[in-house]
Amino acid sequence: EIFYNYNNKTELFGDIYQKSKEETAMVQLIVGKKGKGKTKQLLDKVNGAIKAAEGNIVYLDKSSKHMYELNNKVRLIDVSGYPIKNADEFIGFVCGIVSQDHDLQEMYLDSFLKNAKLEGKDITDALHQLKEISEAYKINFVLSVSMDKEEIPAEFQDDIIIAL
């Protein structure tokens, strides 16, 4: 339990915040081939989430092109500026972000295959790792993945929230 003292009132916030974070901890997928509108869906979702967010929101992208389409409360990180060579390094990069922000509630990963260096490769291990991170740190991940619904591994079919 975490108590905060504010204006001589001691209030319990920790349990309430932790409970609401636990309810949202998951990995969600927006899928569809390149050019189908996944990024627009992701931007709409992140900007809509700002109103209800109790913690911080991070948006990872392959460039800073969408900077002005994001609410200024969302932290945009241009992944192309970092020397990431493979999926393991990308997951390490995500863990680094998680470790530096204890109030992180949601991460939006645009161009997931490109940023995670998984184009043309199996995404199963990376999705499992993101699920583990999500459960361990109570962070909701929303990914845009340039694959058709049928190409997504069977065990992650239930995580698809939008198929274009």
Regions found by a protein language model. Give the residues of each.
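Short, Lys/Arg-enriched N-terminal segments with co-localized hydrophobic residues
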Residues: 1-25
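Compositionally biased, low-structure terminal segments
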Residues: 4, 14, 90-91, 142
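Sequence-level detector for tyrosine residue identity
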Residues: 4-8, 17, 59, 68, ...
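Short amphipathic alpha-helical segments, especially helix-boundary/capping motifs
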Residues: 23, 67-72, 103-108
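Conserved P-loop
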Residues: 26-96, 152-154
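Short loop/turn elements that form and flank the Walker-type P-loop nucleotide-binding site
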Residues: 53-54, 70-72, 101-103, 136-138
